[in-house]
UniProtKB/Swiss-Prot annotation:
Protein name per UniProt: 2-alkyl-3-oxoalkanoate reductase
E.C. code: 1.1.1.412
Key word NADP present: yes
Active site, UniProt feature: 139 (proton acceptor)
Length: 330
């Protein structure tokens, strides 16, 4: 089968491409840049922007299914830039699937679409948690819009499903763990609150596996068609324990210092005002959204994913940490 993966050059995107090739599929990746890693895998590459409808239409031509993983992620930036990539880009993918008669669309979403300030989510499935309101971050806001459009597009000719993997980590990660480690080594990392809030994470192989299983089960009228699912390792840990285990795996110093949520929230608000005012580059070290995320319990039920497409995490956190440590030492 010929499959297109949008955002195939990213951390999860490369895992999806690699796994699909291993499963015997012909894989194309749609990215804004060329990735030598994909070339080594034997993955075809098409360069373009998700916000360009003609580029997306061209990329989708001739494929049998689409994994729409491409997105603008992050905790900072203009709403329009996120809207163009995440909402308009998703609209373009759906339209291209319609135009070319594609039958299956697997969408990579995020648990952040249900973010509601410091309201906890503990042990619930996606159908038990409403979408968020008054988002403090354009990423979460635009991903929520995009997810709803993907699910609304599900019908007899195009089967769709949305997966919400939580905090993906593992060897090859260039974002989550490297940023934590850098700040820890600089003595700039702090916990928000007492660090007792339990959170879910997802080892990279498990995140990819969930996509493959959902894809294989997806068809018009299938149990997973038109639905969203939280995805994780199903092993929630207190934030303090999680962060320090990840830091230890990459040889970074542990973090014990903490600031209160109120202090973190105020710092985030100040950063959000100063960054555009002073025209500072990059992302601020803290935002209101991040402050809320870092102190709030977020862990989910894997039962819906197990029931509807057989998802059972294959790599435990303990084994994932061992693999991360080995890759860091290599």
């Amino acid at each position: 089968m010929k499959i297109l993966v949008t955002g195939g050059g990213g951390f999860l995107g490369q895992a999806l491409c690699r796994g699909l090739v291993e499963r015997g599929h012909q894989v194309l990746a749609f990215n804004r840049s060329h990735y030598p890693e994909l070339q080594v895998m034997g993955v075809g590459q098409i360069r373009g922007d998700l916000a360009d409808p003609q580029a997306v239409l061209h990329a989708v031509a001739g494929v049998d299914a689409v994994f729409h993983n491409g997105a603008k992620a992050g905790a900072w930036g203009s709403y329009d830039s996120y809207h163009q990539a995440n909402v308009i880009g998703t609209d373009n993918v759906i339209a291209a699937c319609r135009a070319h008669g594609i039958g299956r669309l697997v969408y990579t979403s995020t648990p952040s679409v249900t973010h509601r300030a410091t309201h906890p989510v503990e042990g619930l499935g996606a159908d038990e948690v409403p979408y968020g309101e008054d988002f403090q971050a354009p990423y979460a806001a635009t991903k929520a819009i995009a997810e709803q459009r993907v699910l609304a597009a599900n019908d007899a000719s195009l089967a769709t499903v949305a997966l919400r993997p939580r905090l993906i980590w593992g060897p090859g990660d260039q974002q989550l763990v490297p940023r934590l480690a850098e700040r820890a080594r600089q003595g700039r990392l702090r916990l928000v609150g007492d660090g007792s809030n339990k959170v879910d994470t997802t080892y990279i192989d498990n995140a990819a596996l969930a996509h493959f299983l959902a894809f294989e089960a997806l068809a018009p009228g299938a149990a997973c068609a038109g639905k969203a699912y939280f995805i994780s390792n199903g092993e929630p840990l207190p934030m303090r324990e999680l962060v320090n285990q990840l830091l230890a795996a990459v040889g970074a110093p542990r973090v014990d210092k903490a600031i209160s949520f109120k202090t973190a929230y105020r710092i985030g608000a100040i950063c959000e005002r100063l960054w555009p005012l002073l025209r500072l580059r990059g992302e601020p070290p803290l935002t209101r959204f991040l402050a809320e995320q870092l102190c709030t319990p977020h862990w989910y039920s894997m039962e819906p994913a197990r029931r509807d497409f057989g998802y059972v995490p294959q790599v435990s956190i303990e084994e994932g940490l061992r693999r991360l440590k080995a890759s860091s030492a290599a």
